[in-house]
Amino acid sequence: MAKFIKGDLIYNEKFDEYAIFLGASQWVGWIRVCLISTGEKSQVHDYIWELA
């Protein structure tokens, strides 16, 4: 997993999606993000995201 800092712009190539990193999730292997396309706050798998 990449080490993201709160506020980092991150990118998911598989889904062509950008998000703002909000922090770690309570679940192992997940992170909290705000999706740029919808503004939705969500928890997602961390391994498919990279720094934009």
Predicted region positions:
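Basic/aromatic-rich interaction segments and small domains that mediate binding to polyanionic partners
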Residues: 9-52
